[in-house]
């Protein structure tokens, strides 16, 4: 039990990461139409926020804290609009997948950083972002960071979750990694339903069908090493984003054929 239940900080981590995930989803959904693949909404929202933070921080030196507040307000408005338009923000299948992996979520929220690259880059960069409120520069060096010029897209996730929590969250990346895999599981279900010509399966999202999507992404190995899924490494998010791009490209080719 000590590996699953430790203290109240586990609840704080889960709630904060979930808030960021819903914000990503709301923003992504607001950018798409009724015919979109809803499972890709978080990726779209994350991408737009990454572009906004990078542009504002690099070109105009706008503090991250101010951008976070603006992003929160925008996401709240987008969430209300999407809810009224679609009747919800997060697909019901995703919520069922979360319920199926509650023990895994408890384990992840009890975890702390443990891998070498986390201490040299993946958690130290977001900590600098949280403490300095700006990108690294001549006047704001990140002295202990190994790769300060590395793209910041993935670091925004840990930063935003920590900003919501009010404390630095070492396990935010691991939680988002699992959320991303579950999201991709819904895409796998959509492809299966399309292949067997039963699109109604996606709409019904019964427990058996949903569990198949979860098994497809959690039991398989999405990266070169399964253990890094439960870390702040960027390999899992990169794999999911790449897979999403491949699927979208394939669907575009099918539509044009």
Outline where the language-model segments fall:
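Transmembrane signal-anchor helices characteristic of membrane glycosylation enzymes that use polyprenol
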Residues: 79, 93-117, 220-221
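Membrane-interfacial, low-structure loops and terminal tails that flank and connect transmembrane helices
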Residues: 4, 85-92, 194-206, 256-257
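Active-site lumenal/periplasmic loops and adjacent helix-entry segments of GT-C-fold
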Residues: 106-211, 226-232
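Aromatic- and kink-enriched transmembrane "portal" helix at the membrane-lumen/periplasm boundary
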Residues: 6-9, 13, 57-58, 205-240
């Amino acid at each position: 039990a000590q590996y699953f239940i430790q203290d109240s900080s586990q609840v704080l981590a889960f709630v904060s990461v979930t808030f960021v995930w819903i914000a990503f989803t709301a923003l992504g959904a607001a950018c798409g139409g009724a015919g979109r693949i809803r499972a890709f909404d978080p990726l779209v929202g994350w991408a737009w926020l990454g572009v906004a933070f990078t542009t504002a921080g690099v070109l105009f030196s706008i503090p991250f804290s101010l951008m976070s507040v603006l992003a929160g307000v925008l996401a709240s408005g987008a969430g209300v609009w999407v809810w009224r338009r679609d009747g919800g923000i997060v697909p019901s299948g995703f919520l069922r997948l979360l319920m199926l992996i509650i023990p895994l979520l408890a384990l992840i929220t009890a975890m702390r950083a443990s891998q070498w690259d986390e201490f040299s880059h993946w958690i130290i960069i977001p900590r600098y972002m949280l403490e300095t409120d700006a990108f690294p520069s001549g006047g704001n060096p990140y002295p202990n960071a190994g790769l300060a010029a590395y793209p910041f897209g993935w670091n925004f996730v840990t930063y935003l979750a920590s900003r919501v929590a009010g404390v630095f969250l070492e396990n935010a990346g691991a939680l988002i990694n699992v959320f991303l895999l579950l999201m991709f599981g819904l895409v796998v279900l959509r492809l299966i339903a399309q292949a067997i010509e039963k699109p109604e399966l996606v709409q019904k999202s019964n427990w058996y069908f949903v569990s198949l999507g979860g098994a497809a992404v959690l039991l398989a190995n999405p990266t070169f090493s399964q253990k890094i899924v439960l870390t702040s490494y960027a390999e899992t998010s990169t794999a999911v984003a790449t897979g999403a791009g491949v699927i979208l490209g394939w669907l575009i080719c099918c539509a044009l054929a």
